[in-house]
């Protein structure tokens, strides 16, 4: 489900004032093209296979890092493990990082949390998500069967099989907090890293049913990258 080789999809991209856009390394774990379009409006995007190591990514001299959505169990070995390691290395290196869906789950694993199979997967375009910082409720589009455990409450609404990953250590070298939860079952829908320009969301901001819901999250990330480059 990943691309074959790294390529810049919009080389030489500039903003409305003719200034070069920041360069983003986007790890493709099964990325939707709508997400790439959203990113390409804000960044010069280096589209990288999920098997790309962080050392290989650094050769592109990125200003930021993105981990995409994708299918399957985030705890499986292989490409997902490489993507998780690259994500954790990007956080430790101080790059701004955003993760969506599977990218969110990989961030959870890198933070030492377990991922697990949900009793009832989140499917459809009407999943309510609460921003715990503002109290705002977003109506989101979701399509996933795994979740990241709550650091305080553990696995919420788990599948009867008990399928889950092992709990690990925090490879991010940064504390984190739960920022978003599902209003129906209270499962974790997003993390903010404390003291880092990094966050994740479990849902699809590029496909939200409301006229404005969630798509500004791409703008939030772009602002983080601008702040990073401004020092």
Predicted segments, located by residue:
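Catalytic beta-strand/loop cores that center a nucleophilic Ser/Cys/Thr
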Residues: 136-195
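RNA-binding accessory domains that recognize and position tRNA/RNA substrates
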Residues: 1-60, 72-74, 82, 169, ...
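Active-site-proximal beta-strand elements of phosphoester/diester hydrolases
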Residues: 23-28, 140-141, 199-203
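Short, Asp-centered acidic motifs that coordinate Mg2+ and/or phosphate
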Residues: 63-64
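Residues that mark the start of a beta-strand
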Residues: 21-25, 44, 96, 139, ...
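Cysteine-nucleophile active-site neighborhood
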Residues: 69-151, 211-220, 225
């Amino acid at each position: 489900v990943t691309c074959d080789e790294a390529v810049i999809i919009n080389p030489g991209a500039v903003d409305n004032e003719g200034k070069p856009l920041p360069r983003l390394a986007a790890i493709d774990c099964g990325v939707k093209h709508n997400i790439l379009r959203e990113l390409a409006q804000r960044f010069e995007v280096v589209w990288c296979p999920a098997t790309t190591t962080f050392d290989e990514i650094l050769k592109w001299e990125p200003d930021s890092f993105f981990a995409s959505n994708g299918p399957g169990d985030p705890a499986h070995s292989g490409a997902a493990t490489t993507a998780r390691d690259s994500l954790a290395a990007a956080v430790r290196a101080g790059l701004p990082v955003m993760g969506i869906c599977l990218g969110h789950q990989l961030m959870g694993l890198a933070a030492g949390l377990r991922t697990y199979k949900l009793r009832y997967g989140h499917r459809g375009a009407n999943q309510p998500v609460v921003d715990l910082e503002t109290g705002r409720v977003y109506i989101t589009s979701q399509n996933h069967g795994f979740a990241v455990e709550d650091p305080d409450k553990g696995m919420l609404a788990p599948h009867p099989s008990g399928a889950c990953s092992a709990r690990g250590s925090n490879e991010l070298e940064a504390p984190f907090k739960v920022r978003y939860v599902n209003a129906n079952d209270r499962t974790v829908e997003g993390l903010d890293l404390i003291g880092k320009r990094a966050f994740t969301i479990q849902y699809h901001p590029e496909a939200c049913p409301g006229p404005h819901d969630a798509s500004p999250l791409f703008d939030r990330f772009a602002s983080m990258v601008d702040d990073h480059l401004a020092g």
